[in-house]
Amino acid sequence: MGLMLIDWCALALVVFIGLPHGALDAAISFSMISSAKRIARLAGILLIYLLLATAFFLIWYQLPAFSLLIFLLISIIHFGMADFNASPSKLKWPHIIAHGGVVTVWLPLIQKNEVTKLFSILTNGPTPILWDILLIFFLCWSIGVCLHTYETLRSKHYNIAFELIGLIFLAWYAPPLVTFATYFCFIHSRRHFSFVWKQLQHMSSKKMMIGSAIILSCTSWLIGGGIYFFLNSKMIASEAALQTVFIGLAALTVPHMILIDFIFRPHSSRIKIKN
C-alpha cells in the first residue's frame, strides 16, 4: 500500500501532535501518589505501564486480527469517554458509542476499500471475521447515533450534534488517515490536554508536567524510530510506518486507557466532590 503525501502528513500529525497527549501520564500518576516514597512508586507505575504496552505489542504479532479488534473496541470507549466528559449529555452510553465509533466503526466501513488495505498491513493478511464483527458494531453505533442526536437536538446542545455530524461527513469524503489524524489530534488530544491541565495545575508544578511530557515524548519517538528502521529492513517504508504508528499506538492505548478512564477520571471526580 503506497501512501500519498497527505497520508504521510497525517501520520506525522499523529506522531508529533497526537501521541504526546499520552506523555502526561507520568505527571498524572505522580499527582495521585500521596506517600513519601513518590519517586519509587512512580517508577513502579511506569514499569507496569511499560510492561503492559510491551505485552500488547508482542501479542499483536501473535494474534494480529484479535489485537486489532481489541484496539478498535477500547478506542470506542476511550474516545467516547473523553468526548462525553468534555460535553456531558443525558444519555451517556449512546453519546460514548456515537462519538467513539466515528473513526473506529463508521470510518472503516464507509472507506472499506482503503481501510481493508490498511488492516491487511497491520495484520499481515486478510481479516474477514473482523469485518463481520464490525457490522455488528455498526448496528450498535447506528442506534447510538440516533439516540444521541435526538437527545442533543432535543436539549438544544447543537454544538455536540454538529460535531458528530461533521465528523461523519469528514469520514465519508476525506482519506481515512486524514480523518483519523484530524479527530485524534485536534479533538481527542486537545480535549485530553485541556482536561489534564485543568486537573493537575493545582496538584503538580507546570515545569514537572511539561518536563515529564517532553522526556516521555522524546523517548517514545526514539523507540518508534528504532522500530520503524527495523521494520523498514523487512518491508517497504509505507508499511513499516503504518505498523509502527498504529501498532505502537495500540500498545500505548492499553495502559493509557486504564490509567485515564478507570483510575484518573474517578479519582478526579472524588476530589471534585470533596471540594
Swiss-Prot record:
Keywords: Cell membrane, Dioxygenase, Iron, Membrane, Metal-binding, Oxidoreductase, Transmembrane, Transmembrane helix. It catalyses: all-trans-beta-carotene + O2 = 2 all-trans-retinal. It is found in: Cell membrane. GO terms for molecular function: beta-carotene 15,15'-dioxygenase activity; carotenoid dioxygenase activity; iron ion binding. Fe cation binds at H21, H78, H188, H192. GO terms for biological process: carotene catabolic process; retinal metabolic process. Its cofactor is Fe(2+). Could be used for high retinal production. It is a multi-pass membrane protein. Binds 1 Fe(2+) ion per subunit. Optimum pH is 8.0. Changing H192A: 5% of wild-type activity. This is Beta-carotene 15,15'-dioxygenase. It comes from Uncultured marine bacterium 66A03. The gene is blh.
